Amino acid sequence: KALRAPEHKLTVTGVRELAPYTELTVHCPSLLGANTAILPPTAWARMWIQQGGRQHQRAYTLTRINREHATAIILVLHHEPSGPASRWAKRVKPGATVSVQMMGGTSYRPPSPGDRMLLVGDQASAPALADAVAASPTSSPATVVMLAPEAGFLPLAARDHRLIRVNPEVSEEKLLAAVDRTLWADTGDLALDWVFI
């Protein structure tokens, strides 16, 4: 907060458990309303969680923004050991408020129609990847390589795309090999137009 970026108050209006996530519906006219600057896909906010007499900063993607109703969805991933944001999300109730700042998090270059897209990430970045695919032209073939278990909820874009889940226990080398195999199988080369990692 020392950098004095504009601060907004998000009001939690809905809470839903989608293990391993908690889905929060938030309302904020000053950030998400029809008269505010349009946030690009994958935009993320710095959330300030009050806990143990301190404020802890965590960044979360604002997805499915509805400017008419000034709402968005935030997915908080739970893992062990749990951190301040995870503990807060597990007990938060509708009506609670939390401070956020937009300081960075809005750089985004959209793909052009027909661009071949590759997106690589894990469960923490899954909301941003889903947001990027959903906002892309339907003529752009998209492949998502996700470091995530085969079972369990994973946020996905509604539009047609290819999803490859890779066991989180594998090494980075095996993950990269899986990406290479996928591209060679699809195209016979490694040419890509747009990459999001």
Q: How would you describe each model-predicted region?
A:
Residues L3, K9-K90:
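Ferredoxin-reductase
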Residues A5, A19, C28, L39-P40, ...:
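Intrinsic-disorder/low-complexity coil detector
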Residues H8, H56, P111-D115:
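Generic, low-specificity signal for short hydrophobic/alpha-helical stretches with a mild N-terminal bias
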Residues P84-I197:
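FNR/FR-type flavoprotein reductase catalytic core
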